């Protein structure tokens, strides 16, 4: 009898342990299912909550850290995402997806060497997955290695010939190499594959605009806006095209539309300020330049153009202060010296004006002696500093996600 009771007790312990183990496994499966569902629905904070619990239940599950990294990446927490991707590949050194997404994250940091190393590791582990070549092509593009980017997009297109995004990316690479014919052919192919994606029309429209084919460019932007009425990048580009055609009110309307959705868009504020000044609405122009400088107090061109607005308003001392700031930020700014000389002459400060004039001439001579071809240089006095700026302006690069192409998702 005693032996029977002992056996039953041991059996009960084993049953309880098994039930506990089953319950724990059920909990893990439940949190994984909830987390992945939230991830697929774009509910990234909710996904992280589930993966946080799961990471405590099982500290060795590399998928948990990987999926949590994906959620953090999509929320913009790139450092947190990288930490989780690091953890996933430490737990499983042959985990392709971990290297893939860590590489993508490194590229977002601008760490292209590390990014390419991770993507190469992923390719070595899984050479048949062409999505890796797409992602590496994007990284090569961001690293301005356009020839290599094209080769990777070629390889991807051979396997996935009906993916319009690959043609858009390869077209952008050709464009940066100056091959506009191949670029427009790729944009045409992308549009043919997906006539309802505004991105193809925006890119082709920008290419047409660069070739001064403004009617075709505006036609493409109109189509992009028809497909996506909230596409601020299309409105912004169409505004510049209208400006080139001297349709200033149409340009102003498009810039206003951008600012409805993105009131802190410095580049759009800057361009609207220039148009307002050109139309004689100096108070409005001054307000926009003030807002630009509140966003970025080291914006050289905003100081330069606000000074011009002050001159039109007869506020010469204010203009001098802004030219001083522009020159302080960029001492080789010949045009700023020239304009400051003009203002000092108006104020009767002739010796100082002559000194600025001489400095401007010296800067111009030095610049021309270098035979610099960069038309965007602040020292190039042939540039129209009162013209609208596109995305070549340093201070504007954060305003639009222009050529930052998307990597392939995990399969």
Q: What do these predicted regions represent?
A:
Residues 8-18:
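Bacterial N-terminal signal peptides
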Residues 2, 21-411:
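Alpha-helical tetratricopeptide repeat
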Residues 1-9:
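Bacterial N-terminal signal peptides that target proteins for export
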């Amino acid at each position: 009898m005693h032996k029977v009771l002992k056996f039953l007790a041991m059996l009960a312990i084993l049953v309880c342990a098994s039930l506990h183990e089953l319950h724990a496994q059920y909990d893990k499966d439940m949190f994984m299912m909830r987390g992945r569902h939230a991830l697929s629905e774009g509910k990234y904070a909710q996904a992280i909550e589930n993966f946080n619990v799961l990471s405590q239940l099982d500290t060795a599950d590399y998928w948990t850290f990987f999926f949590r990294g994906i959620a953090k990446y999509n929320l913009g927490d790139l450092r947190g995402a990288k930490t989780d991707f690091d953890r996933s590949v430490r737990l499983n050194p042959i985990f392709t997806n971990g290297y893939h997404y860590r590489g993508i994250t490194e590229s977002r940091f601008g760490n292209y060497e590390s990014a390419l190393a991770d993507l190469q590791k992923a390719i070595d582990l899984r050479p048949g997955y062409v999505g890796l070549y797409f992602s590496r092509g994007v990284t090569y593009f961001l690293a301005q290695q356009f020839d290599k980017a094209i080769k990777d997009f070629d390889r991807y297109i051979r396997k996935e010939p009906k993916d319009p995004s690959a043609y858009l990316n390869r077209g952008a690479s050709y464009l940066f190499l100056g091959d506009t014919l191949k670029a427009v052919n790729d944009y045409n192919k992308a549009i043919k594959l997906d006539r309802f994606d505004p991105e193809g029309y925006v890119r082709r429209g920008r290419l047409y605009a660069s070739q001064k084919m403004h009617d075709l460019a505006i036609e493409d932007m109109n189509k992009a806006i028809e497909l996506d009425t909230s596409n601020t990048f299309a409105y912004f580009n169409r505004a510049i095209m209208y400006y080139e055609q001297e349709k200033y009110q149409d340009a102003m309307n498009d810039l206003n539309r951008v600012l409805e959705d993105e009131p802190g868009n410095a580049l759009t504020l800057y361009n609207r300020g220039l148009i307002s000044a050109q139309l004689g609405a100096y108070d409005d122009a001054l307000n926009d330049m003030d807002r630009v400088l509140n966003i970025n107090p080291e914006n050289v061109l905003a100081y330069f153009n606000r000074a011009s607005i002050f001159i039109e308003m007869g506020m010469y001392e204010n203009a001098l202060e802004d030219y001083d700031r522009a020159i302080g930020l960029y001492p080789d700014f010949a045009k700023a010296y020239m304009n400051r000389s003009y203002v000092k002459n108006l104020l009767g400060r002739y010796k100082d004006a002559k000194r600025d004039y001489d400095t401007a001439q010296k800067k111009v001579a030095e610049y021309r002696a270098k035979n610099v071809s960069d038309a965007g240089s602040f020292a190039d006095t042939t540039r129209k500093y009162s013209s609208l700026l596109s995305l070549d302006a340093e201070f504007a690069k954060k305003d639009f996600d222009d050529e930052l192409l998307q990597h392939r998702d995990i399969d």
